[in-house]
Amino acid sequence: MAAAFAACMAMVAAFNHLPPKALPQIQAAEGGRNGIAHSNANGSVDYGVMQINSLWVPALAHSTGWTETAVRIHLMYDPCFNIAAAGAILRRNLIETHGDLRRALGVYHSHKPSLNQAYRTRETSAAVRMFTHPDPTLPPLPSAVLPPAPETQAPP
């Protein structure tokens, strides 16, 4: 993920009160890139970094006051707009799922249970790859920053 994407994702996550890792996880699972459109079997199209589905274009046009053509162009070529749209969609999904992040992430992909579950599995795999393997090029944290191990803590 490019640093510019990370900055947009952090800003959008904060604005929409989303967990900071949610948008990078979606991007990794979607595999989208700036300037890319992917045609789907159902005739819809997924646009840009976060693969925003064309079914969202009318709602985005209404909320921005832009034409649908302008929204499509921005979804394709403006990664921060694309990420902002993804954040708004995920926020809506969180409301719809009563705060259940895993379900909201699945609904980001599809409301169909089978597709939803498959996507959640793919998204979880992306999260594990992104967030559980430390970068071997980074130095370890100094021990003074880490709390003492539970067995060495003095009783109260």
Residue map of PLM features:
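Short, solvent-exposed mixed-charge patches
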Residues: 1, 154-156
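Catalytic glycan-binding domains that act on GlcNAc-containing polysaccharides
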Residues: 2-142, 146
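Gram-negative outer-membrane assembly/targeting C-terminal domains
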Residues: 147-149, 153
